[in-house]
Amino acid sequence: MTLDRDAASHVAEVLSEALPYIRRFVGKTLVIKYGGNAMESEELKTGFARDIVLMKAVGINPVVVHGGGPQIGDLLKRLSIESHFIDGMRVTDSATMDVVEMVLGGQVNKDIVNLINRHGGSAIGLTGKDAELIRARKLTVSRQTPEMTTPEIIDIGHVGEVVSVNTDLLNMLVKGDFIPVIAPIGVGANGESYNINADLVAGKVAEALKAEKLMLLTNIAGLMDKQGQVLTGLTTEQVNELIADGTIYGGMLPKIKCALDAVQGGVNSSHIIDGRVPNAVLLEIFTDSGVGTLITNRKPR
């Protein structure tokens, strides 16, 4: 076999650049929220699984939290169950909650676990109900217009927020060289199920584990300024300024708030990364430039 010197040189250069990052993150926990386009393309799905296995192989401890909104929507449509959204949250009645559990805890979770294991990992699938991994309570949503004297309380059904995370379970799995893959379903005080935003679950898991990084895969290149340029490194103070001046708005606000809360809760850095880019997770961790936006309390890159 003829050696392609240019290709070999490129591989050596990549490995050389990655080495200091590998040393820095050995033994550290990284929480990755997996969703969006990265879950829909077969090539990107395979690349994500290989990235997770490689991270574990070099001594990093990945914990995966996944979404599944499009898959839930598809099954609801086939079952002729209409979907309604309030402030970006799916109104989840009992019938919808059954579908959410079926899709997230069954189909999506097991597909991810199987893919990671096929590429040499030891993934184990969980929902927040397993060993009360994610204790939750009903999320209260209110709305007030100038004409109202008091806020209107809106019932959005079985939509929840995280109360606590069973870190003993996750630490046991990580120490046993397993890769936890978590479906964002919480359990209430009376055993009831709650549908929770996957970004929020990932953020709270990262906080509870005091993770090195929280990584949120998205369908955009990262946070952008008003000229459309990606902001590669920001402090929490700078992010708050961008929210105040309207640079960050709309659908990105909940994701950014999750990233901010994680950093303020003890996570070293949060990352908004482009899940459409092959090997996005590895590129963000192991290269100088990364492929998204890093948010930290330290001096940004």
Curated annotation (Swiss-Prot):
Pfam families named among the record's database cross-references: AA_kinase (PF00696)
GO cellular component: cytoplasm
Keywords, sorted A to Z: Amino-acid biosynthesis, Arginine biosynthesis, ATP-binding, Cytoplasm, Kinase, Nucleotide-binding, Transferase
Reactions that this protein is recorded to catalyse: N-acetyl-L-glutamate + ATP = N-acetyl-L-glutamyl 5-phosphate + ADP
Cellular compartment(s): Cytoplasm
Pathway(s) it belongs to: Amino-acid biosynthesis; L-arginine biosynthesis; N(2)-acetyl-L-ornithine from L-glutamate: step 2/4
Residues of the site described as Transition state stabilizer: 33, 255
Disulfide bonds: none
Positions with a binding annotation for substrate: 68-69, 90, 195
EC number from the UniProt entry: 2.7.2.8
Molecular-function annotations in GO: acetylglutamate kinase activity; ATP binding
Enzyme class: transferase
UniProt-listed InterPro entries: AceGlu_kinase-like_sf, AcgluKinase_fam, ArgB, Asp/Glu/Uridylate_kinase, Glu/AcGlu_kinase, NAGK-C
CDD domains in UniProt: AAK_NAGK-C
Main location: cytoplasm
SUPFAM superfamilies: Carbamate kinase-like
One example of a Gene Ontology biological process annotation: arginine biosynthetic process via ornithine
Family (UniProt): Belongs to the acetylglutamate kinase family. ArgB subfamily.
Summary of the function given for this chain in its UniProt record: Catalyzes the ATP-dependent phosphorylation of N-acetyl-L-glutamate.
Record-given protein name: Acetylglutamate kinase
Organism placement in taxonomy: Bacteria, Pseudomonadati, Pseudomonadota, Gammaproteobacteria, Pseudomonadales
Gene: argB
